[in-house]
C-alpha cells in the first residue's frame, strides 16, 4: 500500500517545479542557515568530510558548493595499469552486465531499450549492441563529480530532455524505461578500448548537469534534443581527457551509465548489483591483454558499505512492503 502511494506521487508531484525550487535554494547564500542545512545533511547521510579538500562546513557559501566539493587527491588513487578501466563515480552499482542485442537490464525482470536510451540514435546504438553496461547510482552522501574510466577523446555530446523521476529501487521496478525517459546527457568517446559512452542521467531535484568542456548543460530545460560534435585525435578543437580526470558533475546527483563495445572489456568478476564503488578502483579489464592484471577493488570497511547502502534507495526497504 505504501509503495503504491509513493509510486503514485512520482506521477502526481510537479517534479520540474520541485527541481527548479531545489536548484534555486541550493544556489543561495544564506549564511548560518546554509551551514545549518549542510551540518544536518552531513549528520543524516554520514558524509565523510575528512575526505574533502575543505572539511569545515563553514567554508561553503552555498549548498551547491558543498555538494560538488572536491576531494583530496590522495583519497581516490587511480589504478595505473593501462589494461584496467576504473570506476567513474562514488556510489553503488545498480545493474551491470551484457547488453542483449538492444536490451539493457533496469531491474530484475525489467529491461529498457538501448536505442531509446540513446534518443533513437541507431548508429550510436550499433556501436554497443551485445556490448557491456554498468549503471552506477550516486547517493546523497557521495562525492558528485564524475571521472573518466580511461583515456578518451570526446566525439559527441547529446542533451536529451525528459522526465525527472526519482531513481530508486521502487521506480526501477515499476517505471518502464526509467533511464530512457529521464533527462540525460550522452557523451561519446573514442578510447583505446573502442567507443565508450558515459551517460549522466537526471532525476527529481537534480538541479543541473555539467561537463568540464561545456559547463552547465541543463538548465535551461528547453524541451529539445541538442547535439554537439568534436574532431578526432589531435585536431584543433579536440577534447582529450585522461583516465581518472573529472568529466562532469551533478548538482544534486543521480546516475551514471557506461556503455562499452562488444568484445573489448570484461567487467571485474567481484562486481555485482549493490557493490559499492569508489573512483579509481578497477571496473573492467581489456580483453586484449595477455596477462590478466590484478584488478580487484580494494576492500572497504564494513561501516562504509553499510553507510552507503543506508543512503541508497536502490536497497529494497522491506518495511515499506504491505
UniProtKB/Swiss-Prot annotation:
Its cofactor is pyruvate. Pathway: Phospholipid metabolism; phosphatidylethanolamine biosynthesis; phosphatidylethanolamine from CDP-diacylglycerol: step 2/2. One of its GO terms (biological process) is phosphatidylethanolamine biosynthetic process. Is synthesized initially as an inactive proenzyme. Formation of the active enzyme involves a self-maturation process in which the active site pyruvoyl group is generated from an internal serine residue via an autocatalytic post-translational modification. Two non-identical subunits are generated from the proenzyme in this reaction, and the pyruvate is formed at the N-terminus of the alpha chain, which is derived from the carboxyl end of the proenzyme. It catalyses: a 1,2-diacyl-sn-glycero-3-phospho-L-serine + H(+) = a 1,2-diacyl-sn-glycero-3-phosphoethanolamine + CO2. Residues 308-322 have a biased composition (Basic and acidic residues). It comes from the Bacteria. Its main location: membrane. Pfam families: PS_Dcarbxylase (PF02666). Keywords: Cell membrane, Decarboxylase, Lipid biosynthesis, Lipid metabolism, Lyase, Membrane, Phospholipid biosynthesis, Phospholipid metabolism, Pyruvate, Zymogen. It is found in: Cell membrane. GO terms for molecular function: phosphatidylserine decarboxylase activity. Coiled coil: none annotated. InterPro entries: PS_Dcarbxylase, PSD-B, PSD_type1_pro. Binds 1 pyruvoyl group covalently per subunit. GO terms for cellular component: plasma membrane. The active site is at 90 (charge relay system), 147 (charge relay system), 254 (charge relay system), 254 (schiff-base intermediate with substrate). Its EC number is 4.1.1.65. It is a peripheral membrane protein. Residues 293-322 are annotated as: Disordered. The record marks 253-254 as: Cleavage (non-hydrolytic). Belongs to the phosphatidylserine decarboxylase family. PSD-B subfamily. Prokaryotic type I sub-subfamily. Heterodimer of a large membrane-associated beta subunit and a small pyruvoyl-containing alpha subunit. NCBIfam families: PS_decarb. Catalyzes the formation of phosphatidylethanolamine (PtdEtn) from phosphatidylserine (PtdSer). This is Phosphatidylserine decarboxylase proenzyme. It comes from Escherichia coli O9:H4 (strain HS).
Amino acid at each position: 500500500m505504501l509503495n503504491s502511494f509513493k509510486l503514485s506521487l512520482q506521477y502526481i508531484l510537479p517534479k520540474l517545479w520541485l527541481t527548479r525550487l531545489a536548484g534555486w535554494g541550493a544556489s543561495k547564500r544564506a549564511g548560518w542557515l546554509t551551514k545549518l542545512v549542510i551540518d544536518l545533511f552531513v549528520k543524516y547521510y554520514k558524509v565523510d568530510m575528512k575526505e574533502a579538500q575543505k572539511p569545515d562546513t563553514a567554508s561553503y557559501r552555498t549548498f551547491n558548493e558543498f555538494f560538488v566539493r572536491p576531494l583530496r587527491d590522495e583519497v581516490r588513487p587511480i589504478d595505473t595499469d593501462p589494461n584496467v578501466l576504473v570506476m567513474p563515480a562514488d556510489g553503488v552499482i545498480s545493474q551491470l552486465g551484457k547488453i542483449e542485442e538492444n536490451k539493457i537490464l533496469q531491474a530484475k525482470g525489467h529491461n529498457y531499450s538501448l536505442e531509446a536510451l540513446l534518443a533513437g540514435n541507431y548508429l550510436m546504438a550499433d556501436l554497443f549492441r551485445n556490448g557491456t553496461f554498468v549503471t552506477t547510482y550516486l547517493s546523497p552522501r557521495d562525492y558528485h563529480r564524475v571521472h573518466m574510466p580511461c583515456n578518451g577523446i570526446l566525439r559527441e555530446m547529446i542533451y536529451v530532455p525528459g522526465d525527472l523521476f526519482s531513481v530508486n529501487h521502487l521506480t526501477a521496478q515499476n517505471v518502464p524505461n526509467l533511464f530512457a525517459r529521464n533527462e540525460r546527457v550522452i557523451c561519446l568517446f573514442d578510447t583505446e578500448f573502442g567507443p565508450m559512452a558515459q551517460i549522466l542521467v537526471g532525476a527529481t531535484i537534480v538541479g543541473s548537469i555539467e561537463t568540464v568542456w561545456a559547463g552547465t548543460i541543463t538548465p535551461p530545460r528547453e524541451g529539445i534534443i541538442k547535439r554537439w560534435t568534436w574532431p578526432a585525435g589531435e585536431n584543433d578543437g579536440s577534447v582529450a581527457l585522461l583516465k581518472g580526470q573529472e568529466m562532469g558533475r551533478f548538482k544534486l546527483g543521480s546516475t551514471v551509465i557506461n556503455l562499452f563495445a562488444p568484445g573489448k572489456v570484461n567487467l571485474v568478476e567481484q562486481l555485482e548489483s549493490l557493490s559499492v564503488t569508489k573512483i579509481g578502483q578497477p571496473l573492467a579489464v581489456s580483453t586484449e591483454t595477455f596477462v590478466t592484471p590484478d584488478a580487484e577493488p580494494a576492500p572497504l570497511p564494513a561501516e562504509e558499505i553499510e553507510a552507503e547502502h543506508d543512503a541508497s534507495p536502490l536497497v529494497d526497504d522491506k518495511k515499506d512492503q504491505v
